[in-house]
Amino acid sequence: DYSTRTSRTHEHYAQNYFLDIKLHYFLKLDHNTSRPVTIWGAGFKGKTIAKRLVEKGISFHWICDNEKKIGKEIYGVKLQPFEDLKEIINPQTIVTVANETEQKQIVAYFDNLNMKSMIDYFFFC
């Protein structure tokens, strides 16, 4: 591993570039426009996805478990506690939480709601 390798320096390997690709193909192939979009996570990736959806004019719900962020408005969307997901009718959720332990808890939460991976929720991590 070295600091000058292409995957460390080329713009196409930037974190946000991959997010843009994932979002593009999610919207093209997986998103059901009759279902509301939800973003789970309000870190760098969550904010990037939120910004892109706003730019595309796609409305969405935004959930997280960070008490400091819940209730705040970012890009014109108010962050809600993740428990509000169960009140959203038939959502498709983009998960942007990178922490593996939290990802397992998130999957367990989806399981409790009878939601299926790659149909009802998608990890963008």
Range-by-range predicted roles:
Residues 1-125:
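Hydrophobic, well-ordered beta-alpha structural blocks that scaffold small-molecule cofactor pockets
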